[in-house]
Swiss-Prot record:
It comes from Mycobacterium sp. (strain KMS). This is 4-hydroxy-tetrahydrodipicolinate reductase. It holds the Pfam family DapB_C. The keyword NADP applies. Catalyzes the conversion of 4-hydroxy-tetrahydrodipicolinate (HTPA) to tetrahydrodipicolinate. It is an enzyme of class 1 (oxidoreductase). Its main location: cytoplasm. It is found in: Cytoplasm. One of its GO terms (biological process) is diaminopimelate biosynthetic process. GO terms for molecular function: 4-hydroxy-tetrahydrodipicolinate reductase; NAD binding; NADP binding; oxidoreductase activity, acting on CH or CH2 groups, NAD or NADP as acceptor. InterPro entries: DapB_C (IPR022663), DapB_N (IPR000846), DapB_N_CS (IPR022664), DHDPR_bac (IPR023940), NAD(P)-bd_dom_sf (IPR036291). NAD(+) binds at G7, A8, K9, G10, K11, V12, G75, T76, T77, A102, P103, N104, F105.
Length: 245
């Protein structure tokens, strides 16, 4: 399988290039960065592209890849419901193309989201805290937003979080994602971390995941690269590849 990388000179992108080159069953074709022509992916007969770029360019990248029949594995964040809908519309015209978009490729992070969804209906209160390096472009992180949505869906028949706060500085209680408070921290020295805090009478539960190095994303990305062509259309998250759905 012939694999290209968009954002190849970025920190995550460079890690993906090394991972593809080290895989016996994959062939690295080309890396494309800002200012480079996307046509290089066609010229090198690339089958699958790994995209770790920026929310401001990822939609243009996807339109090009779908139009040219190149499968995409996307780790770039910033996908709103509207963006997901747009990708689905593009794919409807290209039924042979496949796109997998995941808010997080670290297996532990995916499992922590799954565990949080399972725990959600057993606790009265829940909040999400995500912690990242200060160069991250979006807040809250895609992982935190998806975690909150999964928790909210699991709690749809439950009352809202109890919270008597009536006054305070704007933003002090975090962002609201489908009724779940989400707090974002940006701090030098961090990579990618998340805590989900549950509370009820007499007990609390904390589910925490830490990516200490960007290599934590590699197993999930390579799994997606190998499987994406088997799933025409749009797949969100690697949970289906791990039999977690």
């Amino acid at each position: 399988m012939r694999v290209g990388v968009l954002g190849a000179k970025g920190k995550v992108g460079a890690t993906m290039v090394q991972a593809v080159e080290a895989a016996d069953d994959l062939t690295f074709t080309t890396g494309v960065d800002a200012g480079d022509p996307l046509s290089a992916l066609v010229d090198t007969r690339t089958d699958v592209v790994i995209d770790f770029t920026h929310p401001s360019v990822v939609m243009d990248n996807l339109k090009f890849l779908i139009d040219n029949g190149i499968h995409a594995v996307v780790g770039t964040t910033g996908f709103t419901d509207e963006r997901i809908s747009q990708v689905q519309d593009w794919l409807a015209d290209k039924p042979e193309s496949a796109v997998l978009i995941a808010p997080n490729f670290a297996i532990g992070a995916v499992l922590s989201m799954h565990f949080a969804q399972q725990a959600a209906r057993f606790f009265e209160s829940v909040e999400v805290i995500e912690l990242h390096h200060p160069h991250k472009a979006d807040a809250p992180s895609g992982t935190a937003a998806r975690t909150a949505k999964l928790i909210a869906a699991a709690r749809k028949d439950m009352p809202p979080n109890p919270d008597a706060t009536s006054t305070g500085l704007e933003g002090a209680r975090g962002a609201d994602v489908d009724g779940i408070p989400v707090h974002s921290i940006r701090l030098a020295g961090l990579v990618a971390h998340q805590e989900v805090l549950f509370g009820t009478q007499g007990e609390t539960l904390t589910i925490r995941h830490d990516s200490l190095d960007r290599t934590s994303f590699v197993p999930g990305v390579l799994l997606a690269v190998r499987k994406v062509s088997e799933r025409p259309g749009l797949t969100v998250g690697i949970e289906p590849l791990l039999d977690l759905t």
